[in-house]
Amino acid sequence: MTKKRRNNSHAKKGRGHVQPIRCTNCVRCVPTDKAIKKFVIRNIVEAAAVRDISEVSVFDAYVLPKLYVKLHYCVSCAIHSKVVRNRSREACKDRTPPPRFRPAGAAPRPPPKPM
């Protein structure tokens, strides 16, 4: 029988079994390596209230904390919520990672330190 994908929709190579996790959206059991992962960094306060809080704040150099969340989606929820898209057969062979999104005002990241 023909193979549809090079990796059989799994990132496990040589492992017989991987622990399942639950989808963030629908709570379906998904193998850890098959789940689509998304790491979200958000401000705890929405953008509209940031200025109000900074004006009222006693500490002038206080930086509002951020919310760090790792989301795990099953394949169907990831497609439905447009985290990933359907790609053509030729496009599926393209293994380059998607371009990183950087906000316009963000400073460029410093290069890593040599060890």
UniProtKB/Swiss-Prot annotation:
Keywords from the UniProt entry: Ribonucleoprotein, Ribosomal protein
Gene3D superfamilies: Ribosomal protein S26e
InterPro entries (alphabetical): Ribosomal_eS26 (IPR000892), Ribosomal_eS26_CS (IPR047864), Ribosomal_eS26_sf (IPR038551)
Gene: RPS26P11
Compositionally biased region (Basic and acidic residues): 87-97
Region feature (Disordered): 86-115
Example of a GO MF term: mRNA binding
GO biological process terms held by the UniProt record: translation
Any Pfam family matching the protein: Ribosomal_S26e
Organism: Homo sapiens (Human)
Gene Ontology CC, one term: cytosolic small ribosomal subunit
Protein name per the record: Putative ribosomal protein eS26-like
Family: Belongs to the eukaryotic ribosomal protein eS26 family.
